[in-house]
Protein backbone atom coordinates (compact mmCIF):
# COMPACT_ATOMS: atom_id res chain seq x y z
CA UNK A 1 0.00 0.00 0.00
CA UNK A 2 1.44 3.33 -1.06
CA UNK A 3 1.70 5.90 1.74
CA UNK A 4 0.72 9.53 1.13
CA UNK A 5 3.69 11.69 0.27
CA UNK A 6 2.85 14.49 2.72
CA UNK A 7 2.41 13.28 6.30
CA UNK A 8 3.34 16.56 7.98
CA UNK A 9 0.98 18.19 10.46
CA UNK A 10 -0.04 21.83 9.92
CA UNK A 11 2.53 24.23 11.37
CA UNK A 12 0.03 26.83 12.62
CA UNK A 13 -2.86 26.35 15.02
CA UNK A 14 -6.16 27.77 13.80
CA UNK A 15 -8.80 28.82 16.36
CA UNK A 16 -10.86 25.76 15.41
CA UNK A 17 -7.95 23.45 16.22
CA UNK A 18 -7.34 24.76 19.76
CA UNK A 19 -8.76 22.85 22.70
CA UNK A 20 -9.57 26.10 24.51
CA UNK A 21 -10.23 29.61 23.17
CA UNK A 22 -7.61 30.92 25.62
CA UNK A 23 -4.52 28.76 26.24
CA UNK A 24 -1.98 29.53 28.96
CA UNK A 25 1.42 28.16 29.94
CA UNK A 26 3.37 28.56 33.19
CA UNK A 27 6.93 27.76 34.12
CA UNK A 28 7.64 25.98 37.37
CA UNK A 29 10.92 26.91 39.06
CA UNK A 30 13.42 24.04 39.35
CA UNK A 31 13.12 22.02 42.58
CA UNK A 32 9.53 23.06 43.25
CA UNK A 33 5.94 21.97 42.69
CA UNK A 34 4.32 25.24 41.84
CA UNK A 35 0.64 26.02 42.41
CA UNK A 36 0.33 28.69 39.71
CA UNK A 37 -1.30 26.53 37.00
CA UNK A 38 -3.81 25.16 39.50
CA UNK A 39 -4.61 28.49 41.15
CA UNK A 40 -4.94 30.30 37.82
CA UNK A 41 -7.22 27.64 36.38
CA UNK A 42 -9.45 27.64 39.47
CA UNK A 43 -10.25 31.34 39.05
CA UNK A 44 -10.42 31.33 35.24
CA UNK A 45 -13.60 30.82 33.20
CA UNK A 46 -14.11 27.49 31.38
CA UNK A 47 -12.75 28.98 28.14
CA UNK A 48 -9.22 28.89 29.59
CA UNK A 49 -6.88 25.90 29.47
CA UNK A 50 -3.57 25.74 31.34
CA UNK A 51 -0.33 23.82 30.91
CA UNK A 52 2.85 23.80 33.00
CA UNK A 53 6.52 23.35 32.11
CA UNK A 54 8.93 22.41 34.91
CA UNK A 55 12.36 23.94 34.37
CA UNK A 56 14.86 21.11 34.76
CA UNK A 57 18.18 21.97 36.41
CA UNK A 58 19.39 18.76 38.13
CA UNK A 59 21.75 20.46 40.62
CA UNK A 60 19.49 23.43 41.37
CA UNK A 61 19.80 24.85 44.90
CA UNK A 62 17.94 28.17 44.49
CA UNK A 63 21.04 30.28 43.90
CA UNK A 64 20.66 33.61 42.11
CA UNK A 65 23.69 32.69 40.02
CA UNK A 66 21.90 29.52 38.91
CA UNK A 67 18.93 31.56 37.78
CA UNK A 68 21.21 33.79 35.73
CA UNK A 69 23.04 30.84 34.14
CA UNK A 70 19.77 29.18 33.18
CA UNK A 71 17.95 32.31 32.05
CA UNK A 72 18.07 31.03 28.47
CA UNK A 73 15.67 28.23 29.40
CA UNK A 74 12.91 30.82 29.28
CA UNK A 75 13.49 31.10 25.53
CA UNK A 76 13.02 27.34 25.21
CA UNK A 77 9.84 27.60 27.26
CA UNK A 78 8.39 30.38 25.10
CA UNK A 79 9.29 28.52 21.90
CA UNK A 80 7.67 25.32 23.17
CA UNK A 81 4.49 27.09 24.25
CA UNK A 82 4.22 29.21 21.12
CA UNK A 83 4.58 26.17 18.87
CA UNK A 84 1.71 24.49 20.72
CA UNK A 85 -0.85 27.24 20.41
CA UNK A 86 -0.43 29.03 23.73
CA UNK A 87 -1.71 32.61 23.90
CA UNK A 88 -0.05 33.80 27.12
CA UNK A 89 2.94 32.56 29.12
CA UNK A 90 3.76 33.22 32.76
CA UNK A 91 7.24 32.84 34.25
CA UNK A 92 6.94 31.98 37.94
CA UNK A 93 9.76 33.01 40.28
CA UNK A 94 10.07 36.65 41.28
CA UNK A 95 13.88 36.64 41.57
CA UNK A 96 14.63 35.86 37.95
CA UNK A 97 14.19 39.48 36.83
CA UNK A 98 16.86 40.94 39.11
CA UNK A 99 19.10 37.86 38.98
CA UNK A 100 19.35 38.30 35.21
CA UNK A 101 21.22 41.59 35.55
CA UNK A 102 19.22 43.05 32.65
CA UNK A 103 17.58 45.80 34.69
CA UNK A 104 13.97 46.96 34.50
CA UNK A 105 14.10 48.18 30.89
CA UNK A 106 16.11 45.14 29.83
CA UNK A 107 13.49 42.78 31.26
CA UNK A 108 10.70 44.69 29.54
CA UNK A 109 12.55 44.39 26.23
CA UNK A 110 13.26 40.69 26.85
CA UNK A 111 9.54 39.99 27.41
CA UNK A 112 8.57 42.00 24.34
CA UNK A 113 11.11 40.17 22.18
CA UNK A 114 9.94 36.70 23.23
CA UNK A 115 6.33 37.76 22.72
CA UNK A 116 7.03 38.98 19.20
CA UNK A 117 9.18 36.00 18.23
CA UNK A 118 6.71 33.34 19.36
CA UNK A 119 3.33 34.97 18.77
CA UNK A 120 2.19 35.06 22.39
CA UNK A 121 2.20 37.30 25.44
CA UNK A 122 5.23 36.49 27.61
CA UNK A 123 5.14 37.78 31.19
CA UNK A 124 7.55 37.47 34.12
CA UNK A 125 6.34 37.58 37.72
CA UNK A 126 8.91 40.16 38.77
CA UNK A 127 8.04 42.58 35.98
CA UNK A 128 4.29 41.93 36.33
CA UNK A 129 4.61 43.41 39.83
CA UNK A 130 6.02 46.62 38.32
CA UNK A 131 3.18 46.78 35.81
CA UNK A 132 0.56 46.08 38.48
CA UNK A 133 1.83 48.78 40.83
CA UNK A 134 1.88 51.30 38.00
CA UNK A 135 -1.65 50.36 36.98
CA UNK A 136 -2.82 50.89 40.57
CA UNK A 137 -1.09 54.31 40.70
CA UNK A 138 1.06 53.17 43.62
CA UNK A 139 4.18 55.15 44.54
CA UNK A 140 5.08 54.14 48.11
CA UNK A 141 5.34 50.47 49.02
CA UNK A 142 6.39 48.21 51.86
CA UNK A 143 7.79 44.79 50.98
CA UNK A 144 6.89 41.78 53.07
CA UNK A 145 9.77 39.53 52.02
CA UNK A 146 8.30 36.51 53.85
CA UNK A 147 10.61 33.47 53.33
CA UNK A 148 13.04 35.08 50.88
CA UNK A 149 16.76 34.92 51.56
CA UNK A 150 18.39 38.33 52.14
CA UNK A 151 20.06 38.57 48.73
CA UNK A 152 16.75 37.58 47.11
CA UNK A 153 14.56 40.23 48.68
CA UNK A 154 17.25 42.89 48.56
CA UNK A 155 17.43 42.28 44.82
CA UNK A 156 13.66 42.61 44.57
CA UNK A 157 13.70 45.87 46.53
CA UNK A 158 16.45 47.22 44.29
CA UNK A 159 14.54 46.23 41.15
CA UNK A 160 11.43 48.03 42.38
CA UNK A 161 13.42 51.11 43.32
CA UNK A 162 14.96 51.11 39.85
CA UNK A 163 11.41 51.02 38.48
CA UNK A 164 10.67 54.22 40.37
CA UNK A 165 8.91 53.06 43.53
CA UNK A 166 9.67 54.34 47.01
CA UNK A 167 10.34 51.29 49.20
CA UNK A 168 9.54 52.50 52.72
CA UNK A 169 10.40 49.22 54.45
CA UNK A 170 11.45 45.71 53.46
CA UNK A 171 12.25 42.60 55.47
CA UNK A 172 11.62 38.87 55.76
CA UNK A 173 10.32 36.61 58.52
CA UNK A 174 13.69 36.71 60.28
CA UNK A 175 13.75 40.51 60.25
CA UNK A 176 10.22 40.49 61.62
CA UNK A 177 11.22 38.21 64.49
CA UNK A 178 9.14 35.15 63.67
CA UNK A 179 12.18 32.88 63.10
CA UNK A 180 15.65 32.86 64.62
CA UNK A 181 17.52 32.58 61.32
CA UNK A 182 17.16 31.80 57.63
CA UNK A 183 17.86 28.10 58.16
CA UNK A 184 14.78 27.84 60.37
CA UNK A 185 12.72 29.52 57.64
CA UNK A 186 14.08 27.19 54.95
CA UNK A 187 13.14 24.13 56.99
CA UNK A 188 9.48 25.06 56.49
CA UNK A 189 9.88 24.70 52.72
CA UNK A 190 7.91 27.90 52.18
CA UNK A 191 4.78 26.64 53.96
CA UNK A 192 3.86 28.44 57.18
CA UNK A 193 1.20 28.43 59.90
CA UNK A 194 -2.02 30.08 58.83
CA UNK A 195 -2.00 32.82 61.47
CA UNK A 196 1.43 34.06 60.37
CA UNK A 197 -0.08 35.72 57.30
CA UNK A 198 -2.09 38.20 59.38
CA UNK A 199 0.61 38.69 62.01
CA UNK A 200 3.29 39.31 59.43
CA UNK A 201 1.31 41.88 57.47
CA UNK A 202 0.27 43.66 60.64
CA UNK A 203 3.95 43.97 61.48
CA UNK A 204 4.82 45.37 58.05
CA UNK A 205 1.91 47.82 58.17
CA UNK A 206 3.12 49.14 61.52
CA UNK A 207 6.59 49.63 60.06
CA UNK A 208 5.29 51.53 57.03
CA UNK A 209 1.90 53.13 57.73
CA UNK A 210 2.41 55.63 54.89
CA UNK A 211 2.64 52.94 52.19
CA UNK A 212 0.13 53.13 49.35
CA UNK A 213 0.20 49.35 49.06
CA UNK A 214 1.73 46.36 50.80
CA UNK A 215 3.45 43.85 48.56
CA UNK A 216 4.79 40.38 49.11
CA UNK A 217 7.41 38.66 47.01
CA UNK A 218 7.67 35.08 45.94
CA UNK A 219 4.96 32.48 46.22
CA UNK A 220 4.49 32.06 49.97
CA UNK A 221 2.07 29.43 51.31
CA UNK A 222 0.07 29.53 54.54
CA UNK A 223 -1.94 26.67 56.07
CA UNK A 224 -5.28 28.45 55.80
CA UNK A 225 -7.10 25.90 53.64
CA UNK A 226 -9.32 23.02 54.61
CA UNK A 227 -7.54 20.68 57.04
CA UNK A 228 -4.55 23.01 56.99
CA UNK A 229 -3.90 22.74 53.26
CA UNK A 230 -1.34 25.34 52.11
CA UNK A 231 -2.72 28.31 50.21
CA UNK A 232 -0.99 31.09 48.31
CA UNK A 233 -1.45 34.84 48.57
CA UNK A 234 -4.28 34.61 46.04
CA UNK A 235 -6.37 33.14 48.86
CA UNK A 236 -5.16 35.55 51.56
CA UNK A 237 -5.51 38.84 49.68
CA UNK A 238 -9.19 39.77 50.25
CA UNK A 239 -8.91 39.18 54.00
CA UNK A 240 -5.64 41.08 54.31
CA UNK A 241 -6.94 44.04 52.32
CA UNK A 242 -9.95 44.26 54.61
CA UNK A 243 -7.68 44.13 57.65
CA UNK A 244 -5.19 46.72 56.38
CA UNK A 245 -7.49 48.98 54.39
CA UNK A 246 -5.02 49.13 51.48
CA UNK A 247 -4.15 47.08 48.40
CA UNK A 248 -2.11 43.94 48.95
CA UNK A 249 -0.28 42.80 45.83
CA UNK A 250 1.75 39.62 45.55
CA UNK A 251 3.84 38.23 42.73
CA UNK A 252 1.31 35.47 42.11
CA UNK A 253 -1.68 37.81 41.85
CA UNK A 254 0.33 40.33 39.81
CA UNK A 255 1.29 37.64 37.30
CA UNK A 256 -2.29 36.33 37.05
CA UNK A 257 -3.59 39.88 36.58
CA UNK A 258 -1.15 40.54 33.75
CA UNK A 259 -1.99 37.30 31.99
CA UNK A 260 -5.74 37.79 32.27
CA UNK A 261 -5.23 41.29 30.89
CA UNK A 262 -3.38 39.92 27.86
CA UNK A 263 -6.14 37.38 27.29
CA UNK A 264 -8.88 40.05 27.68
CA UNK A 265 -10.51 37.68 30.16
CA UNK A 266 -11.80 38.41 33.67
CA UNK A 267 -11.20 36.00 36.57
CA UNK A 268 -14.15 34.56 38.42
CA UNK A 269 -14.78 35.41 42.07
CA UNK A 270 -13.35 38.04 44.39
CA UNK A 271 -9.58 37.96 44.79
CA UNK A 272 -8.55 41.45 45.83
CA UNK A 273 -8.43 44.91 44.34
CA UNK A 274 -5.88 44.20 41.62
CA UNK A 275 -7.65 41.23 40.03
CA UNK A 276 -11.04 42.88 40.50
CA UNK A 277 -9.82 45.90 38.53
CA UNK A 278 -9.94 43.90 35.29
What are these regions, as identified by a protein language model?
Residues 99-114, 224-241:
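Short Gly/Thr/Asp-enriched flexible loops that form oxyanion-binding sites at enzyme active sites
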Residues 27, 86-93, 142-144, 211-220:
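Periplasmic-binding protein-like
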Residues 235, 243-278:
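C-terminal functional extensions of proteins
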Residues 113-114, 118-182:
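Conserved beta-alpha
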Residues 78-125:
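Glycine/small-residue-rich loop that forms an oxyanion/phosphate-binding "nest" at active or ligand-binding sites
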Residues 82-86, 130-140, 206-210:
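Glycine-rich phosphate/diphosphate-binding loops that line cofactor/substrate pockets in enzymes
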Residues 2-76, 157-192:
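N-terminal glycine-rich anion-binding loop in soluble enzyme alpha/beta folds
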Residues 73-80, 193-208, 212, 224-238:
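A short, acidic, amphipathic alpha-helical segment used as a generic capping/interface helix at domain edges
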Amino acid sequence: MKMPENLEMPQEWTPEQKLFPHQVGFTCPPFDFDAAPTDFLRIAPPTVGVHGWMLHVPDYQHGLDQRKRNFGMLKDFAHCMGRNGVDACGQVGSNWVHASGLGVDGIREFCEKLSDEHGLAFHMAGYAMVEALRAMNVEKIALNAVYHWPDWWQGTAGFLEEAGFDVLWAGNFVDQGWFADQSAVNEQRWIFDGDLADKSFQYVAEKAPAADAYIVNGMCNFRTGQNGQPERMLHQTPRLETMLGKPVIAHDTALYWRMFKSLSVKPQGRHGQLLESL
